[in-house]
Amino acid sequence: MKFLSEDFLLTNESAKMLFHKHAEKMPIIDYHCHLEPAEIYENKKYENLTQIWLGGDHYKWRLLRANGIPEKLITGDGEDYEKFLAFAKTLEKSFGNPIYEWTHLELKRFFHIDKLISSETAKEIWDEANQMLATDDFRPRALIKNSQVKVVCTTDDPVSTLSYHKLLAKEEKDFKVLPALRPDHLISITDGHFADYLTELSAVSGIEIKGFKTMIKALEQRFEFFTSLGGRLSDHSLSTYTFAETKNVDLDSILQKAKENQTLTDLEYNQYITALILEIMKLNKKFEWTMQLHVNVNRSINGPALSKIGENTGFDSMGTQANISEELTKLFSKAAELETIPKTILYSLNQNDWLELVTMIGCFQGEGVQQLQLGAGWWFNDTKKGMENQLEIFASQSLLSNFVGMLTDSRSFLSYPRHEYFRRVLCNFVGQLIENGRIPDNEALVGKMIEDISYNNVHDYFGFFKDEDSNQ
């Protein structure tokens, strides 16, 4: 088969029919990403491929380091073309890595350049693409609109003023840019900055934070504020998690110790985190939001690199907490007692957790369609095999037809072909079920499922268009 042909990843006739007739045409809702709302609003123009393709993309940075490229040409002050050339040389060696496929798919879809990226073609592609980047069609808003994206959910700190979301809500009519609340600084209370952060949270919420309860009250005010601008999700990273009972625990004392940078015991930290997540679950349910939990990841494990380059620069790895599903089961059991389980999407970076998690959440499904979901293959699992494994586990233990599908989790405006990649994998997976006689060869029935997973489910699940839909 020709590289990136029209039937790329589609290995049977049913798959080809499902993709070309049902998945390919569907719009996109990107409900979790790391795009900067300021860049969307300002509609900045990128000068060259390095700026739009390599800036902030730690997926690519890891490959460059594996190829011995000096840091100057990765995150340093090297010339932009030299950085791109280093990437082209690295890409030549990346067969089998999804970045090879994504990068060429992006080049083909956005720039209509059907050439292999290599050290030999780098200058030609650089010049051709940079000419196009100078046009308005390659500004962020045009890239979003032309990718048929209807909603972009950014990742935002509770203390954010959401000023660019406000401006975009007034001025942008082709798509929505909505905030998603991520309170990392309320979880990382041992980093030495907790007291300063509580001061910020108090100021922006207008609530004096005297202890744990008033901190939650301030957080609730931010939920209200985010909701007023279309917010419907919260997102939480728990690298590890250990449940701890919180009854009769002096949470104010733990909070005070953290503010004073005193060392917390493991038990105190676990009590605080459990109490915090339980309150966050309650707030998500109150505001009819969806809670996302990203678990079992080792972040910034290279200490010298963290000190020199910073966080989110490619020094993270899969976590190995073997009992994390058991600990999350205790959390959900407690929330069930309190009747505060919200709609939830669980992502684990360790595939060994997936079967445990999907069977666990099956014990806590509430009223409504698929309230609890196993999230799409995340980060290092954002591969053909990772996607297939997640689909197979979800289908075997729950209702695949209810799955809310793909997200980019990206910092790049050129990442939307990842939705196409996922849809091709999905159609091939389902097509194989048809070919094997495991599900009916019924286009109307199965085609609807493909369209639902591609777009309709996520449209209905999060309620981004609830007001518009109710007026129709």
UniProtKB/Swiss-Prot annotation:
Q: Does the keyword Isomerase apply?
A: yes
GO terms under biological process: D-galacturonate catabolic process; D-glucuronate catabolic process
Q: What is this protein called?
A: Uronate isomerase
Report the superkingdom from the record: Bacteria
Metabolic or biological pathway: Carbohydrate metabolism; pentose and glucuronate interconversion
GO molecular-function annotation terms? glucuronate isomerase activity
Gene name, please?
Answer: uxaC
What is the species listed in this Swiss-Prot or TrEMBL entry?
Answer: Lactococcus lactis subsp. lactis (strain IL1403)
- Which keywords annotate this record? Isomerase
Which sequence ranges form a coiled-coil region, renumbered to this chain? none
Enzymatic reactions: D-glucuronate = D-fructuronate; aldehydo-D-galacturonate = keto-D-tagaturonate
- Do you know which InterPro entries this protein is assigned to? Metal_Hydrolase, Uronate_isomerase
NCBIfam families for the chain: PRK02925.1 (NF002794)
Lineage of the organism: Bacteria, Bacillati, Bacillota, Bacilli, Lactobacillales
Q: Which SUPFAM superfamilies match?
A: Metallo-dependent hydrolases (SSF51556)
